[in-house]
């Protein structure tokens, strides 16, 4: 690990991974709530056209990609909000138009080569220099500040757009703001995970967080944690395993999702087993049943198979004897109804 940290390009790569690991899930949490999980892919393919323009003109590809992605974000929201075309169709047009334009433009570049786009398509975080890092840091700061300041209103729109509109919120403006933040996040992340995989870092940490968090705030924290750990861990693993950083980061994020899904499912099954309804008994409890009788308030419990059983009109409530001993009467688990309701129906 000390060897890794002694390398300038790896330190820069780790810093960029942290920035992307925070920014992408923060924007993604609102996209998941609004069921726009694939909008990052559309933005990424439009950004590809911007990268191609930068390569062709000799300008910084990051800046031209940013202009293209932001313009596409605004266009999609305008078409969706005012035009007759639905949002998914508008996104599809931008999706295919962007990638087609990128391929055609890059073919016209004097230095046309697949390597020109590989770093942007699949990520090449270790090739980012200090200037790139400053640009990424500035764009990531825009995303962090924007999501922090707009989070109450973005949450309101994501939760119920029609109610937010009726409440007087500028829904169209907030939609455009979210689309622009998404475009900026795509550009920030394209050198880390690549334009073809950027949606994964926006969506998968949030999918994992929804399994672990019980509230929107908790889910957001979990998403950022999973995003940062996946990004940093993916960079470290890719260095030692000599694998592409983008694919490694995404596979690690998917691994966290699988572990969380498996663990929460197993925990849910264990809890369901603990609260299994009591089976009916083949015999009736009463003075002649032969089991020890224990006075319990205004009725009598009978000890059977390590539990107390209280006869209540055709069913039996099972009580944990350890809890009875601890608190004097306990609350037990019932086949139907609460213990208080069972007491009301007990034979007197």
Model-derived features: positions:
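Short loop segments and helix-boundary regions at transmembrane helix junctions
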Residues: 29-112, 209-221, 238-241
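Small-residue-rich segments of transmembrane alpha-helices in multi-pass membrane proteins
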Residues: 46-56, 94-105, 127, 171-181, ...
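Cytosolic-side transmembrane-helix boundaries in multi-pass membrane proteins
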Residues: 243-250, 254-278
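Helix-loop-helix "hairpin" substructures at the membrane interface of multi-pass membrane proteins
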Residues: 129-205
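Transmembrane helix-bundle core of multi-pass membrane transporters
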Residues: 3, 8, 12, 91-150, ...
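Peripheral (non-transmembrane) domains and long loops of multi-pass membrane proteins
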Residues: 271-348
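Transmembrane alpha-helical segments in multi-pass inner-membrane proteins
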Residues: 192, 196-243, 247
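Loop-to-transmembrane alpha-helix initiation sites
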Residues: 13-16, 61-69, 88-92, 137, ...
């Amino acid at each position: 690990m000390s060897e890794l940290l002694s390398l300038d390009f790896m330190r820069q790569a780790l810093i960029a991974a942290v920035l992307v690991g925070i920014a992408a899930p923060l924007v993604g949490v609102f996209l998941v709530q609004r069921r726009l999980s694939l909008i990052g892919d559309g933005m990424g393919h439009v950004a590809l056209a911007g990268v191609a323009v930068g390569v062709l003109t000799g300008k910084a590809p990051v800046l031209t990609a940013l202009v293209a992605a932001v313009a596409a974000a605004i266009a999609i929201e305008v078409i969706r909000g005012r035009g007759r075309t639905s949002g998914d169709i508008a996104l599809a047009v931008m999706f295919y138009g962007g990638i087609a334009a990128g391929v055609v433009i890059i073919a016209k570049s004097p230095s046309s080569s697949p390597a020109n786009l590989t770093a942007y398509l699949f990520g090449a975080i270790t090739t980012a220099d200090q200037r790139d890092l400053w640009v990424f840091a500035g764009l990531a700061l825009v995303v962090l500040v924007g999501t922090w300041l707009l989070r109450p209103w973005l949450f309101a729109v994501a939760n119920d757009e029609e109610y937010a509109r009726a409440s007087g919120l500028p829904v169209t403006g907030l939609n455009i703001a979210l689309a622009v933040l998404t475009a900026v996040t795509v550009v920030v992340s394209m050198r880390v995970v690549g334009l073809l995989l950027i949606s994964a870092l926006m969506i998968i940490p949030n999918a994992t967080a929804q399994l672990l968090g019980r509230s929107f705030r908790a889910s957001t924290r979990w998403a950022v944690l999973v995003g940062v750990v996946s990004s940093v861990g993916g960079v470290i693993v890719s260095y030692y395993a000599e694998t592409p950083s983008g694919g490694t980061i995404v596979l690690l994020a998917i691994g966290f999702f699988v572990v969380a899904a498996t663990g929460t499912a197993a925990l849910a099954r264990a809890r369901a087993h603990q609260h299994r309804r009591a089976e009916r008994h083949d015999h009736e409890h009463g003075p002649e049943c032969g089991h020890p009788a224990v006075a319990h308030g205004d009725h009598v419990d009978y000890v059977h198979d390590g539990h107390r059983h209280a006869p209540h009109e055709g069913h039996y409530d099972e009580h944990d004897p350890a809890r009875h001993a601890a608190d004097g009467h306990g609350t037990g688990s019932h086949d139907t109804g609460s213990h208080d309701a069972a007491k009301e129906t007990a034979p007197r």
